[in-house]
Amino acid sequence: MITATQQLESYLESFSEFEKLATGHDLPWLRRLRQDAFARFCEVGFPTTHDEDWRFTNVSAIAQTPFRLARNGRFRLSQKELEPYRVAGVACQLVFVNGRLAREPSLLGKLPDGVKVSNLAGEISSNPGAFEAHFGRYLDIRRDAFSALNTAFTEDGAFVHIPRGTLVGEPIWLLFVSTGDDAPSVSHPRNLIVAEEDSQATFVEDYVSLDGGTVFCNTVTELVAGDHTVLSHYMIEREHTEAFNISTLRIQQGRSTNVVSHSVLLGGALVRNNVHPVLAGDGGECLINGLFIGNGHQYLDNYMLVEHASPHCSSRQFYNGILDGHAHGVFHGRIIVHKDAQKTDAKQTNRNLLLSDDAQIDTKPQLEIYADDVKCTHGATIGQIEGDALFYLRSRGIDEVSARKLLLFAFASECLDRMKQGPVRKHVEGLINRCLFRMANSAPGVSTENRREDSGRSWEEIG
């Protein structure tokens, strides 16, 4: 661990070296943006629990770790290493290793005419005008130190452009792989997704880690939804237990848009998932759906900020948490209804299961309403597995592990049922299946003779 002063000096040295060689260092506007962002980070520093948006989460484990940029580390993966992360039915998968595009393992299947799926560094070099039109336009680096840090160290990530009136039927999968090193390492992937009016598409961000070691992935995604677009965004976090992950999704919605955000948090030591849609055009709809499952000493923080900035918009937030061991979860959901956003219809719900006496959840649904003709509700619940339900299943001849799995899956399926993209849902269900099996199998009430090996069967087969 190092002091705050030592950490700042380390970042100053890293930034000085980085900006000399970074992609786009010869573009005055980008150089100025990076410098302004780094100055802002130096000014505000890492957040503390005195900051209202971070009151439940202590990030000192990140702030006091001497991370070095992963840009000088490993950037290649063998096909064998990547095989566990291939997804059936997905023909377009960009692979990023330690924040940089790995071209060889990436897949670019046939896409509709005009659709562009590439990396940010390439776009900065070959088409800076299109990149400048949206990059950093919607993110508020004044409020968020991690977003400022990401902007300062922006170099690579995904760039996706969907032309007007285009339907992309297959999901566009973005796989981010962090690899361990002798020293703690950090990467700052930056993604820019622009969907023009009347287009439809699905995007997946998938975070994994290899090799062990302390890694930190600090990601920002800007998603621009043009008028009348229908978009789905999935974020899957399944890194190892020495990994830190801060992920920020900033969504800018135009008129009559329908945008869905799904988040599934399964791994990591400390994870912060920020989702911030702004309904900037009349008649927009937004659904934020999430599931977080923690065990051991995991810390999983979900911060949702939905801004209703125009009339006749609706939003829904549904988040479920399952926590065991000493895991700690956070749900902080804010809905802000601006003065002119009349006829707003907004709802947020957070439901949680605590499976041990040491598991914790902090939940704070929050409404800020500055208009007078609105319909807004919010609520949160915290509970445990019902003994009567478990007894009923056991009395029907279902073994204890399977009975617990069925009850946990029924709770998790509330979120799964909102995932409509076939290959993505099937993949996520498999991940949750394995995660909940381990959780049910290791429950304190399960006798040794009843503990079982994972059969790999689906939930329908178990039931």
Task: Tell where the protein language model's regions lie, with residue ranges.
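N-terminal amphipathic, basic helical "cap/leader" segment at the start of enzyme domains
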Residues: 1-148, 318, 323-324
